[in-house]
Amino acid sequence: YRQTMKTVVEPQLAALHEELSMPLSDGGSLHAELYEQPTATRAVVILHGYTESGEKFREMTWYFLQSGFNVYAIDHRGHGKSARQFKETYLTHVDHFTDYVQDLEAFMQRIVLPRTQTLPVCLYAHSMGGAVGGMMLQRHPEMFARAVLTAPMIAPSSAPFPQFVGAAIASVMCALGKSKELAFIGKPFDPASETFESSFSTSHARFDYYEQKRIHNAHLQNSAPTYGWVKEAIGVTKVLLDKEK
């Protein structure tokens, strides 16, 4: 797997790769990676999951390119190379979950739609990205021709506590002014404690390949939420299950 990624996938991606930073209205910028080919017949926007980055989906990007897509991937704010509020890159924070959705709206309007023109645009969103994508579809049901949400974060876990307990703890801590502090369920990035066996991965080779990138790149080391992120993430459930939306 590693050899194929290094000798086939990565070189082909590099030939089409374009990076850009889209300024955000509240400061900082959103990092995006674009892959465009003249023979494309459609386009796809990739939204990664919690503590991930667009970098994790490079293999998936290659498959999409092979299938005739142009690919547009972002790092959500507080992830990857996008704007952060802290120097500690293991912390994952957002003031309002809707910030993710507004970032995506801006990315679509300013970058994707002008570039894709008449191409049908699809959405591929994973985990937390699935929650962002779901809220985007509520706001703009006509924007995407197709949408695939893999393991969407509709009811995030606050283990070891029941969700209502996790929500209560996070709300109290936020009320006490600790919204940007490390939450009780998280810990700093530690490669020694991140093993294939404790992960949700089903491929040891893929886990090792991305984990090595994380070890050597601080911007890929998100591993823990703040109380503010926990509070906002748990609040997503009510929004996504609202039948009126």
Q: What label would you give each PLM region?
A:
Residues 1-23, 28-36:
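An N-terminal hydrophobic leader/cap segment in hydrolases
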Residues 41, 49-52:
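Active-site glycine-rich loops that stabilize anionic/oxyanionic intermediates
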Residues 54, 63-87:
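Conserved alpha/beta-hydrolase
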Residues 92-113:
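Alpha/beta-hydrolase active-site loop
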Residues 115-127:
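Alpha/beta-hydrolase fold nucleophile elbow
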Residues 125-135:
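Glycine-rich nucleophile elbow surrounding the catalytic serine of serine-hydrolase chemistry
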Residues 133-221:
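Alpha/beta-hydrolase-fold enzymes
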Residues 222-245:
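Conserved serine/cysteine hydrolase catalytic core
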